[in-house]
Amino acid sequence: LALYFLLDNNLITNKTEINQYFNIMINEVSLDQEIKNLIIYKKGLYNSNTANEQELLSIFQPLISSDNLWRSHSLYVIAEYYYSKNEKNKSKEFFEKILNLEKPNSQIKIEAQKRLQRDFSD
């Protein structure tokens, strides 16, 4: 919670330092796995506007490669990242991955379906 207070109030603005704090919370603090997954997701969101493709995929990799609460959310962020970079095929691939999940977040699934119908229908 302290990290989010620091971020929300712009008390730390150095991206490298902020990412180090995220890494400490993920790797060194004893937390429930789903809480760690939430922190990974928030780290991905924090970096999504400035990270390059490999950095973003690396951050989200633990979430998109395992069954967890944040998997569909992470796939959606990556799909939107590619969409914003005009990489439509990659974007479509990640939106479709959401639809193929066994238990995606229902709202994320609806948003992915809308995006596919609106922007990728032939």
Where in this protein do the model-derived segments appear?
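Short extracytoplasmic
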Residues: 1-2
